[in-house]
């Protein structure tokens, strides 16, 4: 029984007289003792879990019985585990909690996980296929059947393929959240039609990591680190936020220290031992200063550097007159980075000399347990931002913390690649609308330039699918997207696959309701820590019915309305395109047991799970097959504590037919490197052409960028005097501060009314995620505004107070927002968070009314647009009584509409930071006002295009380096010009 303190004499008398109640009596003897409570239900209870209804307490204890069905959260990219509580009486989802068996999230979720129930019950969600009526974008819609939509879409695709217009069929996705199914579809169609959002997200960082190792993402082992360097806000909102935050906290609890590099005092920075609010765009210089200290104080792992870097190649080509030894290489490094002293970094970056030196020493002293991560942040913000991740990884190479316990590993070591049934072969197509010749090194598709390419007449789209993708609101230059989405001569048919209306779906021809995270099947796997796991996202109501013995063959039978799921939709569409199999498409979507029937999701995932290492044995131990095991538990850990994969010795079978080059020591099979011989043993190495970590990149010379062969510092577009890609390894500190932004340190211009700042527009809020959180009432009650963060010293020059209106003027327009005066931002920098500023017009269907404002949109002529907020979020009538309780009236400002595109000429990453003018709002300005000139945005696109060095200029016969990975990789023949 729970502990109850003994009563004193006076209290006993009071109880006896009835003055106070006798709480010794157990009013609910059926309730368990406190000692028996657990944070989670045991998996043995998941089929029939009893819980008392909180809504009826304390009047009575009403027992509810649930089936707990595991699935995967889809409210960010972390893939955390969820348990859906399916009410056995009503067959509805009551709530979502964490899945304690999930290796990444371990039963813990952020606010976004439980808020999945809000999305399921959203009164504005789309429950049936909708087709446009009237002009595209005017707001007219009618309900149609799935059969009608499939027939229309399939007919257009069939015609496009028959007429060899393969590049006109495109699938454009934001967050896929799944592994492999859409690749199957597009390859079966024979199109190079995959487009993604990665070049507005993470391509900058990916490119820098890839140059080093051939792997484009890091996998930090935070829990075992001694020192963590974060160029992010990972305790609250960064990539793989929840799993990473847990392990950062564990590392700190074990004694690790952490430094955060960020102009903004994030919650993560507030918890760190060191906050380094650098001048935006100078982060690479700071990292090279750390390297300078580590080199000069000999805080290096000499053996690792000698064994695993391509120092011999670098010395032979660039320093042939120097000693061709590792000591000669280290001496050369000291000379190369000699000017990046702590004093230089202090002057350039605006941080203290002592802090630079102290953090550098802590990195060096941590050695193999130095851990770091960057994903967006500075790498996504600036021209040359890819050098930030490259310089960051340089610190790992110097300290030998690559692939070590407590260090940082390549992501692919901890991410499972599924073996899938009957995969189609790669296509021979190359879509230059996605991979243009101007950007041969772009790490992902140049997706944010699609409207500009269409306007230039580079091509057209006949069938354009958008999925988990809202570029009108999420991307820069959203009005240019509206212009091309409305134009049927540029986009013939736009199909929006979405559970909810959004700013891009308003300009579609079909809006087809796809299932939310708990309403569809997906296989997920992410590099959340030093282990490898898979998780099964499944439609929980369908699975609950199946477990109860009901026959369900189509997810629409269990989902709300006629909401479908992608897998079944794509299978049906492929059969509609190729009903008799004559096009060679249908065969990839036929049942393996009966070719006259479509492939089922059960068959697809059964094959995938049958081939997961160790899963069959784990399932057999419980007398289950692998699919049943995954349905029951939702997750499986394949490997734990995976380190040092580059040292793996290759087997005789792996080396069958291999030859060893006597000079490079590369082991190759049919000309393809498979490993490297070191000290007489052939081991795996890394995925670079040399199989070593490439400090020196011959690729950069081969593709026309010889000034960037080694880690360096490129002047950001925020700070540059002229449009250039000048490296900074040869620029002295006395020429650091450009005149373009000399207002950034509090030096007012002659016109006090209008000042130039750096706008930081990309930071996330812990409670929101892109478009998806707009329909979650709990999340929007927590976070509704995205004010302008401005330092107290900057605000004082205008006597600005929190809540005052300010106008932010970009190169193509302006927006009006409210100020938040704070010391949590570096002077000379203003910041505005992502996620907010959702909008709809009166003519549009009700959409995300928990978060969106009603606006008017005017075309003023000559490419000029104006958006005015008419009213913010307000109460509305629905089946959810909370919709009448909305108390907030500000939905934020859609700042991205006012940003021109800034494509980095090398990585292809959109450089998010903006050089803006800030001033108090004029008397006619209103919060939420947006004015944009798309003619000017097109001119800026061309200015940035002129920075590129297109493939023909380099003398290359290839479109792209063959060793660079890319999504939906075509045949090698397609790479050739």
Q: PLM features: residue spans?
A:
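Surface-exposed intrinsically disordered loops and tails
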Residues: 546-560, 587-598, 648-674, 726, ...
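Long, well-ordered, tryptophan-enriched scaffold segments
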Residues: 255, 259, 264-367
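N-terminal export/assembly segments and adjacent metallocofactor-ligating motifs
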Residues: 1-299, 465-467, 511, 517, ...
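Short, solvent-exposed secondary-structure boundary/capping segments
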Residues: 823-836
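Extended redox/cofactor-interaction regions of prokaryotic respiratory oxidoreductases
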Residues: 182-248, 254-259, 285, 392-510, ...
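Long, C-terminal catalytic modules of enzymes
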Residues: 539-636, 865-889
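Short conserved beta-strand and strand-loop elements enriched in small hydrophobics
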Residues: 802-813
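Glycine-rich phosphate/diphosphate-binding loops that line cofactor/substrate pockets in enzymes
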Residues: 150-168, 218-227, 336, 357-372, ...
């Amino acid at each position: 029984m729970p502990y109850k303190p003994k009563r004193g004499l006076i209290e006993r008398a009071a109880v006896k007289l009835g003055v106070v109640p006798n709480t010794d009596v157990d009013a609910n003897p059926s309730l368990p003792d406190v000692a028996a409570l657990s944070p989670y239900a045991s998996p043995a209870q998941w089929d029939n879990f009893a819980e008392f209804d909180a809504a009826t307490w304390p009047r009575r204890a009403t027992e509810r019985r649930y089936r707990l069905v595991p699935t995967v959260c889809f409210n960010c990219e972390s893939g955390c585990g969820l348990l859906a509580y399916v009410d056995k009486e009503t067959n509805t989802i009551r709530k979502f909690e964490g899945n304690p068996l999930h290796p990444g999230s371990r039963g813990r979720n952020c606010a976004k996980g439980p808020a999945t129930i809000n999305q399921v019950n959203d009164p504005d969600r789309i429950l049936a296929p909708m087709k446009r009526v009237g002009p595209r974008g005017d707001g007219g819609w009618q309900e149609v059947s799935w059969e009608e939509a499939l027939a229309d879409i399939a007919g257009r695709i069939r015609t496009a393929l028959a007429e060899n217009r393969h590049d006109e069929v495109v699938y454009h996705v934001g967050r896929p959240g799944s592994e492999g199914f859409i690749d199957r579809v597009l390859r079966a169609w024979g199109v190079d039609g995959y487009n993604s959002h990665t070049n507005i997200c993470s391509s900058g960082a990916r490119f820098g990591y890839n140059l080093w190792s051939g792997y484009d993402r890091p996998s930090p082992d935070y829990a075992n680190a001694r020192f963590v360097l974060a160029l992010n806000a990972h305790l609250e909102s960064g990539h793989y936020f929840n799993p990473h935050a847990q392990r950062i906290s564990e590392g700190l609890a074990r004694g690790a220290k952490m430094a955060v590099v960020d102009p903004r005092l994030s919650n993560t920075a507030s918890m760190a031992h060191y906050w380094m609010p650098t001048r935006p765009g100078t982060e690479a210089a700071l990292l090279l200063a750390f390297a300078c200290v580590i080199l000069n104080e000999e805080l290096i792992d000499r053996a690792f550097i000698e064994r695993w870097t391509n120092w011999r190649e670098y010395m032979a080509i660039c320093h042939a007159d120097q000693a061709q030894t590792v000591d000669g290489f280290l001496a050369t490094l000291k000379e190369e980075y000699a000017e990046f002293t702590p004093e230089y970094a202090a002057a350039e970056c605006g941080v203290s000399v002592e802090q630079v030196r102290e953090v550098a020493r802590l990195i060096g002293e941590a050695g193999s347990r130095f851990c770091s991560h960057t994903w967006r942040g500075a790498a996504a913000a600036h021209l040359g931002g890819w050098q930030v991740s490259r310089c960051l990884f340089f610190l790992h190479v110097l300290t030998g913390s690559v692939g070590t316990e407590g260090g940082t590993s390549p992501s692919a070591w901890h991410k499972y690649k599924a073996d899938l049934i009957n995969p189609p072969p790669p296509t021979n197509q190359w879509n230059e609308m996605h991979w243009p010749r101007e950007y041969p090194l772009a790490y992902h598709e140049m997706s944010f330039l699609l409207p500009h390419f269409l306007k230039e007449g580079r091509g057209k789209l006949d069938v354009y699918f958008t999925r988990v993708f809202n570029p009108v609101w999420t991307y820069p230059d959203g009005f240019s997207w509206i212009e091309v989405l409305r134009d049927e001569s540029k986009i013939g048919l736009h199909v929006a696959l979405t559970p909810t209306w959004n700013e891009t779906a308003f300009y579609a021809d079909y809006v087809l309701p796809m299932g939310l995270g708990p309403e569809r099947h997906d296989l997920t796997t992410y590099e959340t820590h030093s282990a490898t796991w898979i998780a099964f996202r499944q439609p929980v109501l369908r699975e609950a019915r199946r477990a109860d013995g009901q026959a369900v063959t189509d997810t629409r039978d269990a989902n709300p309305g006629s909401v479908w799921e992608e897998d079944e939709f794509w299978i049906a569409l492929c059969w509609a395109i190729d009903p008799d199999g004559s096009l060679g498409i249908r065969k990839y979507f036929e049942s393996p047991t009966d070719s006259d029937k479509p492939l089922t999701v059960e068959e697809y995932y059964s094959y995938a799970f049958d081939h997961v290492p160790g899963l069959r044995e784990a399932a057999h131990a419980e007398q289950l097959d692998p699919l049943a095991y995954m349905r029951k538990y939702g997750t499986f850990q394949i490997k734990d504590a995976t380190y040092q994969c580059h040292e793996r010795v290759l087997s005789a079978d792996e080396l069958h037919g291999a030859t060893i080059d006597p000079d490079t020591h590369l082991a190759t099979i049919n000309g393809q490197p498979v490993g490297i011989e070191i000290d007489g043993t052939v081991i795996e190495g890394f995925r670079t052409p040399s199989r070593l970590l490439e400090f020196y990149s011959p690729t950069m010379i081969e593709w026309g960028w010889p000034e960037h062969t080694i880690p360096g510092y490129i002047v950001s577009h925020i700070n540059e005097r002229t449009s250039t890609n000048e490296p900074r390894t040869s620029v002295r500190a006395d020429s650091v501060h450009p005149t373009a932004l000399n207002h950034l340190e509090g030096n007012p211009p002659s016109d006090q009314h209008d000042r130039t700042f750096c706008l930081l527009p990309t930071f996330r809020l812990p409670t929101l995620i892109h478009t998806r959180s707009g329909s979650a009432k709990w999340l929007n009650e927590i976070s509704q505004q995205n004010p302008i963060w401005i330092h107290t010293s900057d605000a004082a020059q205008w006597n600005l107070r929190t809540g005052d209106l300010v106008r932010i003027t970009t190169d193509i327009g302006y927006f009006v927002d409210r100020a938040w005066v704070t010391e949590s931002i570096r002077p000379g920098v203003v910041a505005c968070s992502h996620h907010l500023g959702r909008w709809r017009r009166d003519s549009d269907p009700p959409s995300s009314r928990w978060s969106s404002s009603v606006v008017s949109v005017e075309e003023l002529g000559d490419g000029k647009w104006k958006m005015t907020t008419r009213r913010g979020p307000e109460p509305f009538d629905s089946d959810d009584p909370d919709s009448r309780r909305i108390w907030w009236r500000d939905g934020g400002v859609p700042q991205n509409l006012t940003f021109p595109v800034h494509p980095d000429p090398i990585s292809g990453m959109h450089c998010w930071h903006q050089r803006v003018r800030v001033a108090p709002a004029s008397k006619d300005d209103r919060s939420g006002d947006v004015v944009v000139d798309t003619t000017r945005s097109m001119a800026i696109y061309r200015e940035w295009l002129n920075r590129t060095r297109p493939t023909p200029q380099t003398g290359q016969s290839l479109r792209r380096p063959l060793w660079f990975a890319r999504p939906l990789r075509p045949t090698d023949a397609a790479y050739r010009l």
